[in-house]
Amino acid sequence: MREATMKRALILIGLLALGLALAQKPKVVIGTGSTGGVFFYYGTALADILNKAGAAEAQPVQTGGSYDNLQLLRDRTAGTTYYCALTTTDSAYVAYTGEEPRFKDRPAKTQRVLFYMYPSFIHLVTTEKTGIKVVQDLKGKRVSTGQPGSSTENLALLVLQGARVKPESFAKRERLPVAEGAKALAEGTLDAFFWVGGVPTSSIVELSQTLARKGDRIYLVPIDPKSTTAQVAMKKFPGLVDPYTVPKSVYNTRTDVRGLATGNIVVCPESLPAETGYAIMKAVFENLDTLRTAVAAAKDTSLEATAKLYGKLPIPFHPGAERYLKEKGLIK
């Protein structure tokens, strides 16, 4: 009798343990970016959507951007904690292939694509009073090329290479995140800064308003996609860096600004369970209006844009994302 009771108790304990294990959601940590940049706000809104939908226990973390996020994905994913990364497509590409120095010895081969977010414009921001009109005018000026090792810095250096402008020719080179770059430009301690980010970027919108109050005006240096200045970046990342035009209404510039943009994607580790990847896709695209209300740049987040990226990158899609896209009839 006692033996039978003990067996029933053990079975009950086992079933309870199994139930708890099944009920426990995977923990998803989302690498975002610096405050003032779109990655930070997008990642925060994404985590909120996943939590409310019950897709995962999601937590956003502030980082230096794409490469930091990809390193977290590669190095910190363990057990039932999965690090997902918001990243530009060019950063994901060179991290996967090992062309980026910090991934040379250990490429981020475990990353898998979930969905496309929006394009990131290569902003070269200055003011009308600096007299900077083209990239070559940066010589002798105080310029920030973005945070060290960031996608902003890497693309800025490619633009400078195309324009035959060496950072050594600057009066002073800074390596600031977008919010600090905008603050320095507004205060007159910087002449221009690069930023690769969504349109609009809140820090640059605020900068435009600040400059207007001071009797100055923001100026985005145009980059002709057909110029040699643009071709270095476009050839480095064929199909991943494309022409893009920022309407004058976005930052209150005098004219629309032609330039270049790279895409942004959400990637996850290969080990993320297929059902969790599917649940993330379902949560995001069933709550797209909520995401777009929270982040203006999310107007470009769509299943169609995600499907267009399928097969364009050497990075495989996550099985959960593939299943969702197939159910919607967007891929075979």
PLM regions with names:
Residues 89, 100, 130, 167-267, ...:
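Pocket-lining segment of extracytoplasmic ligand-binding domains
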Residues 141-158, 236-279, 284-302:
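Ligand-binding clefts/hinges and TM-proximal coupling segments of bilobed small-molecule sensing domains
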Residues 44-48, 61-105, 124, 132, ...:
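Pocket-flanking alpha-helical
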